């Protein structure tokens, strides 16, 4: 029987490396592709960290309500509590942990949105108050300016009226020209006005006509 070079080489290789020979595809043979095993959708590692797989079950309304009630009591999930909830709901502990993790993330996002809305409303109110106060300041400045102009106008009117009044001018002139004691001067010893009085003898009777004649 005649062998080709390839057949001789293959026979030689099979004797030296039997394990390698089994992996070499013979001429004319078709290598069947290996089928990859599909992973179950939604499957994750078991809670104890082993290689076991579980199918993620869709939660019922009752299970969701019980999880929501438990989350309302305490946002953090401890190991004992996780196992107890999983046993009560008939779920895998890992699925309960994932649900709590997602629910806590939504709760934090909601809190951030609420805080943001509160701060935004406070900021808007402060801006409105600021605009209102600025408007009041402008109005008060205008009123102050008008009041200052009115005070200045009244002051100018009073000054102009007092300087041009004829009554005040005549009174001031007469007061300067008329002495307080007339043409008589009053000395310190009183001698200057002794001639205005006439001595009257004691025990003498002077009638009214004679008394008046002394000063006429």
From Swiss-Prot:
GO terms for biological process: response to auxin. One of its GO terms (cellular component) is nucleus. Residues 112-140 are annotated as: Leucine-zipper. Disulfide bonds: none annotated. SMART domains: HOX. Induction: By abscisic acid (ABA) and by salt stress. Residues 52-111 bind DNA. Expressed in roots, flowers and siliques. InterPro entries: HD (IPR001356), HDZip_class_I_plant (IPR045224), Homeobox_CS (IPR017970), Homeodomain-like_sf (IPR009057), HTH_motif (IPR000047). Probable transcription factor. This is Homeobox-leucine zipper protein ATHB-40.
């Amino acid at each position: 029987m005649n062998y080709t070079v390839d057949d001789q080489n293959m026979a030689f290789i099979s004797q030296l490396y039997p394990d390698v020979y089994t992996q070499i595809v013979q001429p004319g043979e078709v290598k069947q592709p290996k089928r990859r095993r599909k992973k179950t959708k939604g499957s994750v590692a078991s809670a104890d960290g082993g290689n076991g797989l579980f199918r993620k079950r869709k939660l019922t309304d009752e299970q969701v309500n019980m999880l929501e009630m438990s989350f309302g009591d305490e946002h953090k999930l401890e190991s004992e509590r996780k196992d107890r909830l999983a046993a009560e709901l008939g779920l895998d502990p890992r699925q309960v942990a994932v649900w709590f993790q997602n629910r806590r993330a939504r709760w934090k996002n909601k809190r951030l949105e609420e805080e943001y809305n509160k701060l935004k409303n406070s900021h808007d109110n402060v801006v409105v108050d600021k605009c209102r106060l600025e408007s009041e300041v402008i109005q008060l400045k205008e009123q102050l300016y008008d009041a200052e102009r009115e005070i200045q106008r009244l002051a100018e009117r009073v000054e102009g009226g007092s300087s041009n009044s004829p009554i005040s001018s005549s009174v001031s002139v007469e007061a300067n020209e008329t002495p307080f004691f007339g043409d008589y001067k009053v000395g310190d010893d009183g001698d200057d006005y002794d001639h205005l009085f006439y001595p009257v003898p004691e025990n003498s009777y002077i009638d009214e006509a004679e008394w008046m004649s002394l000063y006429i």
